[in-house]
Each structure stands twice: as C-alpha cells, then as structure tokens.
Regions:
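Preference for long, amphipathic alpha-helical scaffolds in soluble/luminal domains
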Residues: 1-292
C-alpha cells in the first residue's frame, strides 16, 4: 500500500501557494492545515452574483460573469468541505436554481447566459432548454447530505431519480453526479437498487467522454463509504489509489486529465485537482495523520 508522505503534502502546498487561486489556498489550509473555514466562505464572495448564484469563472471552463449551475455546484462542494452548506448564501443560490430550472426539474449543463463569453469547447448551450444530470445530481446530493431544505430540491430529486433509474449509457461526469446523488439521497433502499443497476452499466460499457477521458476507480469511490465501492473489488480500488499516490508531478501538483483550452485554466484546475487528490487519499487513510 502506497501512502502520501508529509514531504508530498508540503510539495503540494508549495504548488498551491505558488500557482493556485486565493480560493484554493484557503481550501487547502482549511482541509489540511487547520485553517479557518470562514476564509473559504469569504473567498467565494467575489464569484457570487446579485441574483444569488455563482459565476465569474468559479468553474474555470466557463469564463463569463453570469451565474451557472456548474459554478453553483462548485461553490456548494467547497462549502460542504468546510461544513458551511447551511449558510444563507446557499438559500439565495437555491432561489436562483428554482428560477432557472427546466420543466423537467433539472438544471441545464450550461445556462444560455454564457453566450458570447469565452468557454471550453464542451460548454455548449443546448438547443433545447432541459435538465442535465451533471450539475443537478451533484447539487441535489450535496443538499441532501447537509439536510438543507428548499423548494427546488423536490423536483430536482424527482428528476435525478428519473434519469438514474432509466439511463442506459453514462459518461464519467454523469456517473460522478449520480454517485453524489445516490450517496446522500434519503431513500437508501432505492439508492442501493439504482446503484446496483448503474454499476453494471459502468462495468460493461467503455467509459470516456468526447475528449477521450477515461476513469479510475478512485474517481467514483471518493471515500470508502461510497455506494460505488461495490462496483469494484478491494484490489481494484487499492491499486487505483496506489496509482493516484504515484501520480503527483514534480511541481507538487496532480495532473489535469482533460484538455486545457486557455492557459489560465491550467493553474485554476491544477489547484482544484491537487486538493481533490489529497482529499480522496485522506479519506482512504493514504495520507499522514498529521495532515488533518
């Protein structure tokens, strides 16, 4: 079993301080150095819009100022990390989500307000305004995890069930969103049945996306308690974690495994991905105890 060393964590911290956003500096400090969670909340404020949502390139692939579901998913993820997903700014963001939801109850992957602004090639505004599991499942799952009640969540949950229980093919990001939802939705029996069905799809299809990205078990099993753990043998999970430990680059970061379409996203995603790698390894007891 391979583990991160304290030196590896120090190298990651040096990369974060040298290259990443102020937000990731505070996320790293809060997660691994005993930093103040309030600083993460404060660092999110510049990305918040008057409509209650988040934008302003919080999610690096969408550079426009407007509030986007993917940016709100990111904000909620970071607030969940520091135990602050009950703050009032979450309620105002949910009010915004309610206002922009599609008729099916889901959120679009890209809101049309991105039109005219630089964005990744895969940030395509759909011709039909309809929900996507990628932001909807993740956001709904995080709200369920934190027992945060809001009018938006009911229809969004129904949408997620409809998609998860009927889908016949999924890409990596849809699967990750489904896992976040299934890990946290209250109906555990239904979640288990849906996870068994989804796991068979994941294991029998060739995973990947338009950019030819592949997955590793640790992408789906972010913690030992994840409902997706049953999709893999213990040996598969442990081997993938060994690979993750060994994937740290010379500069202290972990690699971004998708195309970088404009230079700044390399640093913005680099800090994000590096923190995510250490979080996963920490949850699987692959990091030194003094890290957390």
């Amino acid at each position: 079993m391979k583990k991160l060393t304290a030196v590896a964590i120090d190298r990651a911290e040096k990369y974060i301080v040298s290259n990443a956003r102020v937000l990731e500096r505070h996320r790293f400090a809060a997660a691994f150095r005993g930093g103040d969670p309030a600083m993460v909340v404060a660092a999110l404020q510049p990305y918040r819009n008057e409509d209650g949502g988040f934008g302003q390139a919080l999610e690096p692939d969408g550079r426009g100022p407007g509030s986007q579901p993917a940016a709100i998913q990111a904000a909620f993820t970071f607030l969940d990390e520091v135990g602050r997903l009950g703050d009032e700014l979450v309620r105002s963001a949910c009010d915004y989500l309610l206002a922009i939801s599609a008729e099916d109850g889901g959120l679009p992957f890209v809101h049309p307000n991105a039109n005219g602004y630089p964005r990744a090639p895969w940030w395509q505004i759909p011709e039909r305004y309809e929900g996507s599991l990628i932001p909807t499942g993740s956001i709904a799952g995080l709200l369920h995890k934190n027992k945060f009640e809001h009018q938006w969540l009911g229809a969004a949950t129904d949408y997620c069930w409809q998609i998860v229980e009927s889908v016949t093919r999924v890409n990596t990001y849809e699967t990750m969103a489904a896992i976040t939802f299934l890990d946290n939705v209250p109906d555990r029996g239904r979640a288990q049945a849906a996870a068994e069905r989804l796991g068979k799809i994941v294991r029998t299809q060739t995973m990947g996306t338009d950019s030819d990205e592949s997955y590793a078990p640790w992408d789906f099993v972010a913690s030992p308690e994840s409902i997706a753990h049953q999709w893999f043998t213990d040996d598969e999970v442990e081997l993938s974690l060994d690979v993750l430990v060994e994937s740290q680059l010379a500069d202290g970061s972990w690699p971004v495994r998708w195309p970088l379409w404009t230079p700044v996203t390399g640093f913005e995603w680099g800090g994000w991905v590096t923190i995510e790698a250490i979080k996963i390894l920490t949850s699987h007891r692959r990091a030194p105890d003094e890290t957390f």
